[in-house]
Design a protein with these regions (language model features):
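Intrinsic disorder at enzyme termini
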Residues: 1-9
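A non-catalytic, amphipathic alpha-helix used as a structural packing/dimerization or gating element
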Residues: 9-23
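C-terminal helix-coil-helix/basic helical segment that borders enzyme active sites and/or dimer interfaces
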Residues: 26-37
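Internal helix-loop-helix
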Residues: 48-108, 112-120
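Acidic, proline/serine/threonine- and glycine-rich low-complexity intrinsically disordered segments
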Residues: 128-129
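Conserved small/polar residues in nucleotide/adenosyl-binding loops
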Residues: 132-133
Length: 134
């Protein structure tokens, strides 16, 4: 029984993303791991190819896709063997706060850059009582 109902569009997206990873990510994963950083150009290539913030509305340059596009990105990234290009943190954890809570002016200012990879978001938090600093 198939739980996730992928459409033909989803499968085509998966194939495109897999080819992108084979060309633009996997060959460099060890180099990035040793350097301790993923170059900004990798984010920009991923964004310009349409693989960042897949759920962001086309009004801001996004795909306007459903959640399954994000699932595909996560699934395919797991096969690369790299840990640095954590696009799901950017696309699926941080950016949704902007889409849900930012004013229209802030959405117009930041979302296009998030989608294109010109802006890379992050999250930082602290729980002083439990001494957790992420």
């Amino acid at each position: 029984m198939e739980i996730l109902k992928y459409t033909e569009d989803h499968q085509n997206f998966r194939k495109r993303f897999r080819r992108f990873l084979e060309k633009e990510v996997t060959p460099y994963a060890d180099e990035w791991e040793k350097a301790g950083i993923v170059p900004k150009t990798a984010w920009e290539k991923m964004g310009r190819a349409g693989f960042l913030c897949t759920e962001v509305s086309s009004d801001y340059g996004g795909l306007g896709g459903d959640f399954l596009y994000s699932v595909i990105v996560i699934e395919e990234l797991t096969h690369t063997g790299q840990n640095g290009l954590i696009a799901p943190l950017h696309s699926d954890i941080v950016v949704p706060y902007i889409t849900a809570y930012a004013s229209d002016a802030l959405k117009k200012k930041y979302l296009p850059g998030c989608v294109s990879g010109d802006i890379v978001t992050a999250v930082a938090m602290t729980e002083p009582v439990s001494y957790t600093h992420l």
